[in-house]
């Protein structure tokens, strides 16, 4: 799933599975730049309850590179999401 190119001063965010269901969207554009450590708070402001119900168990990628927001890796938390970046919120993967 590719999103439309983000407008100037924004980045794209893709929502999969539970994140898409919770937001009612598959993608949107948010203002850039933003620190990765602030992303979940920004999403919580837009979609109250999403942090605890969805984001706590999701993985996050920035331009297809996994970053660790939940566990607090210092380098990942300080990473700045820039204009034109593509962020994805990915649910846990299971197999059976």
Curated annotation (Swiss-Prot):
Keywords: Cytoplasm, Molybdenum cofactor biosynthesis, Nucleotide-binding, Phosphoprotein. Pathway: Cofactor biosynthesis; molybdopterin biosynthesis. The modification Glycyl adenylate is found at residue 96. InterPro entries: Beta-grasp_dom_sf (IPR012675), MOCS2A (IPR044672), MOCS2A_euk (IPR028887), Mopterin_synth/thiamin_S_b (IPR016155), ThiS/MoaD-like (IPR003749). C-terminal thiocarboxylation occurs in 2 steps, it is first acyl-adenylated (-COAMP) via the hesA/moeB/thiF part of UBA4, then thiocarboxylated (-COSH) via the rhodanese domain of UBA4. The keyword Glycoprotein does not apply. CDD domains: Ubl_MoaD. It comes from the Eukaryota. One of its GO terms (cellular component) is molybdopterin adenylyltransferase complex. The modification 1-thioglycine is found at residue 96. One of its GO terms (molecular function) is molybdopterin synthase activity. It is found in: Cytoplasm. GO terms for biological process: Mo-molybdopterin cofactor biosynthetic process. SUPFAM superfamilies: MoaD/ThiS. The keyword Iron does not apply. Acts as a sulfur carrier required for molybdopterin biosynthesis. Component of the molybdopterin synthase complex that catalyzes the conversion of precursor Z into molybdopterin by mediating the incorporation of 2 sulfur atoms into precursor Z to generate a dithiolene group. In the complex, serves as sulfur donor by being thiocarboxylated (-COSH) at its C-terminus by UBA4. After interaction with MOCS2B, the sulfur is then transferred to precursor Z to form molybdopterin. Heterotetramer; composed of 2 small (MOCS2A) and 2 large (MOCS2B) subunits. Belongs to the MoaD family. MOCS2A subfamily. This is Molybdopterin synthase sulfur carrier subunit. It comes from Phaeosphaeria nodorum (strain SN15 / ATCC MYA-4574 / FGSC 10173). The gene is cnxG.
């Amino acid at each position: 799933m590719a999103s439309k190119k983000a407008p100037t001063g924004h980045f794209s965010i893709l929502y999969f599975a539970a994140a898409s269901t919770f937001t009612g969207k598959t993608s949107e554009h948010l203002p850039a730049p933003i620190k990765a450590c602030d992303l979940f708070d920004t999403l919580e402001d837009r979609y109250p309850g999403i942090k605890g119900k969805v984001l706590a168990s999701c993985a996050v990628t920035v331009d297809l590179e996994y970053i660790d927001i939940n566990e607090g890796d210092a380098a990942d938390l300080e990473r700045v999401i820039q204009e034109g970046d593509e962020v994805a919120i990915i649910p846990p993967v299971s197999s059976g």
